[in-house]
UniProtKB/Swiss-Prot annotation:
Protein name: Probable ferredoxin/ferredoxin--NADP reductase
Gene Ontology cellular component list: plasma membrane
Family membership: In the C-terminal section; belongs to the ferredoxin--NADP reductase family.
Residues annotated to bind NADP(+): R213, N258, G259, N260, V261, R302, R303, E314, G463
Source domain of life: Bacteria
Catalytic activity: 2 reduced [2Fe-2S]-[ferredoxin] + NADP(+) + H(+) = 2 oxidized [2Fe-2S]-[ferredoxin] + NADPH
Coiled-coil segments on the chain, per record: none
């Protein structure tokens, strides 16, 4: 009964290190790890111990006998990653474990290491976790929104609740006694980089890539145009996108680009609102989908089927739950690519695409929109005068023009980082120049003292949620090495002074207790309607919920004050 990794794999590799026989690959030290779409369990080497199940933060692993029908393709996907061996042959258990990168060891100094982390998404939380392994390290996480966890909260599709379970791990990290949240505090507005450095040894920026790459064709910007990432944020109740004008009163939506985000949007637009009602989808989005007139979602790509940007797990998830079709011309392109492509992963995608119909057969899901995957279409302009009415494409590599009428046109062509005040920025690469996480002055090539980056702002928008774990670990290793070598300046202000500064600049800052109050209130609201949670989508509502949080215990406040004063802390234990 070997175990199987399924669609929601986040690539954080906790399962790799939990496995006693090293049967999960690629491991973080292997070349393919950074670009792998998921991790894979070797069914021949697996000893069925289940250690990986409890280690996985997103519940992506199960015995092969407990898979849902839609998950069955992952049995072969896991197995096909490994060489073919005779059926029934079981490998002997091995004592060779995946190599573990040791945690960065912080040397004791007069002042314990104190780090500010800007951002609260996966890269930020994994960095905090790595730092808190060491005794005495204090981590303060700053987030401009009243709620943490970045794209896990606002960028993962509502119907991917397993993926969102990684927030349980993040909540455990945030519960550490040397961890503090400063939510609803924007760096660059309420506090500056220099002020953070005055209160910390180092500042680690894990702010992601918050902007979209824009498609510069005529008509983009008309009402009825937007980006897929904006729509996902709207679906998830991000307060900055509450009022996003999403017009679903027309029969067709066109999405330009065919990565995973494009598939997420197509899948949700075609989903049954009754099924979505059990998720954490925002109320305004659920209402709009219930009244949607959309009958078709077209996902258009410039290149051919062999160059599809979506991952194999996402394609499997899409075709398992929606009516997905290809035009006859695109079906022939799939067959042509199958005849020449050798890469196993690409062939797996093409084989699934080759099974899709052309839409002439009766719909599998009566009354639901169908999804059409279209290839070799290069967008030329958005049609319409006062609002979008469709898209004009050319067939890639030719002068042939094609037109698709649509009432909503979305682009999904990638994310882009944006400049951070007081730090250098590479406009072309859209990231902060760095060497292994150390921010580098591009003029001199020298490190910027006390400044570090992790996640997408460090490496660009690549990888998956768990990819940020190894990325953040590398940055923390560099930061700790600099601290140990005396290259980081001790903070000149006390923790209490930081609290006072934050309170003066942003009286509505929210701490860990406030976040727990918001979280509990959302879960309670959802529970009343049989939902995972019912999110607050307005900042004022979040702030009101946060005020119900209990005050920090007097004992903890006294201990914090004694630490500020440098007084010894003596605990009396009754005999």
């Amino acid at each position: 009964m070997p175990h199987v990794i399924t669609q929601s794999c986040c690539n954080d590799a906790s399962c790799v290190f939990a496995c006693p026989v090293n049967c999960i690959h690629p491991t973080p030290d292997e070349p393919g790890f950074a670009t792998s779409e998921m991790l894979y369990i070797d069914p021949v080497a697996c000893v069925d111990c289940g250690a990986c199940v409890t280690a996985c933060p997103v519940s992506a692993i199960a015995p092969n006998t407990r898979l849902d029908f839609e998950q069955l393709p992952f049995v072969e996907i896991n197995a096909s990653y490994y060489p073919k061996r005779p059926a029934g042959v079981k490998l002997a258990p091995t004592s060779k474990l995946a190599p573990v990168t040791p945690a960065a060891e912080v040397r004791v100094r007069r002042q314990p290491l104190t780090v500010a982390v800007v951002g609260s998404g996966p890269a930020a939380m994994y960095a905090a976790d790595e730092l808190l392994v060491q005794q005495g390290v204090q981590v303060n996480v700053f987030e401009k929104l009243p709620t943490p966890y970045g794209l896990v909260r606002s960028g993962v599709a509502p119907d991917h609740q397993n993926t969102k379970r990684v927030t349980r791990l993040f909540d455990r990290i945030a519960g550490h006694r040397r961890f503090r949240f400063y939510l609803n505090v924007e760096i660059g507005k309420h506090l500056g980089h220099a002020e953070l450095l005055a209160h910390h040894h180092a500042v680690l920026y894990a702010v992601g890539a918050p902007d979209d790459r824009r498609l510069t064709i005529d008509g983009m910007g008309l009402p009825g145009t937007g980006t897929a990432t904006e729509l996902v944020a709207w679906l998830n109740g991000h307060p900055d996108f509450n009022d996003l004008p999403v017009d679903l009163s027309h029969e067709r939506v066109v999405i330009i680009g065919n990565g995973n985000v494009a598939l997420d949007v197509a899948r949700v637009l075609a989903a049954d609102p009754h099924e979505l009602a059990a998720t954490d989808i925002a109320d305004h989005a659920l209402s709009a989908l219930r009244n949607s007139a959309v009958r078709e979602v077209v996902v258009a790509a410039r290149r051919g089927p062999a160059h599809s940007a979506f991952t194999l797990p996402e394609l499997i998830g899409l075709t398992a739950g929606a009516d997905v079709v290809l035009d006859p011309g695109d079906h022939q392109r799939v067959l042509d690519d199958l005849a020449i492509v050798a890469d196993p992963l690409t062939r797996n995608k093409l084989e699934i695409l080759s099974t899709l119909g052309d839409g002439s057969a009766p719909a599998r899901r009566v009354g639901r929109p169908r999804i059409r995957l279209a290839y070799r279409l290069t967008p030329r302009r958005v049609l319409g005068q006062r609002r979008a009415g469709g898209v004009q494409f050319s067939v890639t590599g030719t002068d042939e023009l094609r037109q698709l009428d649509a009432g909503l046109v979305l682009t999904s062509i990638g994310y882009r980082g944006k400049p951070i005040p007081d730090l250098p920025f590479d406009e072309q690469a859209a990231l902060v120049p760095n060497d292994g996480g150390r921010v580098i002055d591009p003029g001199t090539g020298e490190p910027v003292p006390g400044a570090y980056v992790a996640g997408w702002i460090k490496r660009g928008p690549t990888g998956f949620i768990g990819t940020n774990k190894s990325c953040s670990m590398q940055t923390v290793q560099a930061l700790v090495a600099d601290f140990n070598d005396g290259r980081l300046t001790d903070p000149v202000a006390t923790p209490t002074a930081l609290d006072q500064l934050v309170q003066a600049r942003q009286p509505q800052a929210i701490g860990c207790a406030g976040w727990r109050a918001i979280d509990a209130a959302e879960i309670a609201r959802g529970s009343a309607d049989g939902r995972v949670r019912n999110k607050f989508t307005d900042v004022a509502e979040m702030l009101a919920a946060a005020t119900s949080a209990p005050k920090e215990p007097l004992r903890r406040r006294v201990l914090a004050r004694l630490r500020d004063l440098g007084q010894p802390i003596v605990l009396t234990v009754p005999l």
